[in-house]
Curated annotation (Swiss-Prot):
The keyword Ribonucleoprotein applies. NCBIfam families: L21. Residues 79-102 are annotated as: Disordered. It comes from Staphylococcus carnosus (strain TM300). Part of the 50S ribosomal subunit. Contacts protein L20. This is Large ribosomal subunit protein bL21. Keywords: Ribonucleoprotein, Ribosomal protein, RNA-binding, rRNA-binding. GO terms for biological process: translation. One of its GO terms (molecular function) is rRNA binding.
Amino acid sequence: MFAIIETGGKQIKVEEGQEIYVEKLDVNEGDAFTFDKVLFVGGDAVKVGAPTVEGATVSATVNKQGRGKKITVFTYRRRKDSKRKKGHRQPYTKLTIDKINA
């Protein structure tokens, strides 16, 4: 059985036991988290939401709060001796999918 959930403005296909990385959620490590925005449930019985599946939830456990790899943002204006260098690390949350309730 699998489901498609929406979190952080993205749609993610998940299965039970899978580890996923999502945009940062405001929860502590080791806590349980429930996704209510389930768009699709597949498997033996297919359920398609309009826009979400009524009564369907996905339960997950928070493994880690972290930050991604650093990217460098470099901007310059030619012939003007003007340049700017910045770095950015995107925060993320690592989850393990425990159960899909449909």
